[in-house]
A protein has these predicted regions:
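Catalytic cysteine-centered active loop of the rhodanese-like fold, especially the PTP/DSP P-loop
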Residues: 440, 449-494
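N-terminal module-boundary/linker segments of secreted carbohydrate-active enzymes
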Residues: 1-26, 30
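Carbohydrate-binding surface patches
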Residues: 250-253, 258-260, 300-344
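Flexible, polar/low-complexity N-terminal or interdomain linker segments that lie immediately upstream
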Residues: 386-431
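Glycan-recognition surfaces
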Residues: 120-123, 164, 168, 172-262, ...
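C-terminal beta-strand-rich structural cap/linker in extracellular carbohydrate-active enzymes
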Residues: 363-392
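Structural recognition of the beta-strand scaffold that forms the well-ordered cores
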Residues: 10-16, 45-51, 89-94, 135-140, ...
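Aromatic-lined carbohydrate-binding/catalytic grooves of carbohydrate-active enzymes
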Residues: 32-148, 152
Length: 494
């Protein structure tokens, strides 16, 4: 078996969704591909240009996919060809069920109806990956969720077909499962990467939520198989300091570095962040190990303020480590660390600041002052090392399906004092909502506990119109410490 058929390190590139959603076109894709070259990003390793949802145009009488003629008058194979002509790789999108997320949320109508892989797995995958020559495929789950499909069964079927194409064509293909939560241990043997949390938003709490979502998942990260924290929100409104922390933590976690902004409008300061070759090397380290926190600081009320994370480089229990000092708070904070706490034993041979690119004094005790929402990252080498126990690794993570409760159960919980939360947009909420429901759009739930419900034991029932946003909301709230969250799912009459 050729090792070249499988990518060993996390993906790097650009994807269309965060910037365009379904408002994408052949011209826009080519502009961003050109920008990967002109900005020098491709030289740094950003080589994938991935087309997300928004290109479908239904199916013909033989079940073959059609493509949106206004957005893609020449079809989509031209995009794979164009990417390859630039020395890039091309990615494509599909859905594990019948209807795409764009159909459900972006008014794609007939264009997104019945265009998912369900019932057309071999036909579509062979077209995308063999006939058209795409190198990557992301498979979403909006339609699969609505159909009530078993995700392990369906994604495993898809993965087997992709693997057959991979070996038949002798091409490296990358398969991403997009289920908006960790699917379960089975996914490691099926996909190259998998989403672990709700969709990322362009704000700092959402960035840190993504990081928190994979704290217990380090055991599932390794060469060729990584936890996916979602496309980065760099270039979409974060401060430069927050972009720096965002990028740093993605590199520490060995997760795909996929940009999701307009590359033609990036500032030099932002480009310098995402072109930091020393940080990219941390992300692309051959051992592909995930960082984990070893120390943390909390407020008097228990709010997490700061952490120190370590990442082994080259191998487990290495004497070379990346150490991240992270300040989540809005005040400067000084973080202290003894080298042995990070498993670094004996004489310290080198200490390098990966943002200032300076060699520092070799010391065994660190005292680092970190500014609000900022990060400091050192690469440290010692004479020897010992194991540091990852306290977050509690064994195999049990996958808990997001099971719906009935309307009857939901109303009973509300009658007993539960909060009923509509996670749709304010506009959707105003048009029609369930009686007694409060409106907290999914996009603002990251800071929900700080502004709305200080008691994390509050019983909460979440719903939307189709199921995806409320499924993600349940996942997000549970990651943020809410213990009693119930999923009503999609309420079709809304």
């Amino acid at each position: 078996m050729s090792q070249n058929l499988y990518r060993r390190t996390p993906l790097m590139g650009w994807a269309s969704w965060n910037y365009c959603r379904t408002n994408i076109s052949e011209e826009k894709m080519k502009v961003q591909m050109d920008a990967l070259i002109s900005t020098g990003l491709a030289e740094c390793g950003y080589e994938y240009a991935n087309l997300d949802d928004g290109f479908f145009g239904g199916r013909d009488e033989n079940g073959r996919l059609l493509f949106n003629k206004e957005r893609f008058p020449n079809g989509i194979k031209v995009l794979a060809d164009y990417a390859h002509s630039l020395g890039l790789k091309a990615g494509i999108y599909s859905e594990g069920g019948d209807n795409t997320c764009g159909f459900l949320y972006d008014n794609e109508g007939a264009n997104g109806t019945g265009v998912g892989l369900y019932g057309h797995e071999e036909q579509d995958l062979n077209m995308f990956l063999d006939e058209f020559g795409f190198d990557f495929i992301k498979v979403d789950w909006c339609g699969g969720l609505r159909l009530g499909l078993d995700e392990e069964t369906q994604y495993t079927k898809i993965g087997k077909i992709i693997d057959e194409i991979r070996h038949r064509t002798n091409r490296q293909l990358v398969f991403n499962v997009c289920r908006w939560q960790f699917p379960g241990a089975w996914v490691v043997n099926v996909a190259d990467s998998w989403r672990t949390g709700a969709d990322i938003n362009p704000n700092f709490p959402s960035v840190m939520y993504q990081v928190d979502s994979i704290k217990p998942l380090a055991r599932y990260c390794g060469p060729g198989h990584v936890n996916d924290l979602d496309m980065m929100q760099i270039g979409n409104g974060l401060t430069l300091t927050e972009e720096k922390t965002h990028f740093s933590m993605w590199c520490m976690m060995s997760t795909p570095l996929m940009l999701g902004c307009d590359l033609t409008k990036l500032s030099e300061a932002t480009l310098n962040i995402i072109k930091n070759k020393e940080l990219i090397a941390i992300d692309q380290d051959e051992a592909c190990l995930q960082a984990f926190p070893i120390k943390d600081w909390h407020s008097e009320k228990g709010k997490l303020l700061a952490e120190i994370w370590i990442k082994d480089l080259g191998k487990k229990y290495s004497n070379q480590k990346a150490i991240a000092f992270v300040n989540r708070s809005i005040e400067p904070i000084t973080l202290d660390l003894k080298a042995e706490e990070a498993g670094l034993i004996g004489k310290i041979l080198s200490v390098r600041d990966l943002w200032t690119h300076e060699e520092l004094t070799c010391i065994n005790e660190f005292s680092v002052t970190v500014q609000p929402h900022d990060v400091v990252i050192y690469k440290v080498e010692s004479e020897s090392s010992v194991e540091v126990v990852n306290q977050w690794d509690q064994g195999e993570v049990e996958f808990v399906a997001t099971n719906k409760i009935s309307m009857e159960t939901a109303l009973k919980l509300v009658k007993e004092g539960a909060m009923l939360i509509d996670v749709r947009s304010p506009e959707e909420y105003e048009q029609k909502h369930l009686e007694g429901a409060l409106n907290y759009p999914y996009s603002v739930l990251d800071g929900f506990g700080d502004v709305a419900v200080p008691d994390k034991n509050t019983t909460i029932v979440v719903y939307c119109s189709t199921g995806k946003r409320s499924s993600q909301a349940k996942n997000l709230l549970e990651t943020n410490g809410f213990d009693n969250v119930y999923y009503l799912g999609g309420v079709e009459e809304l």
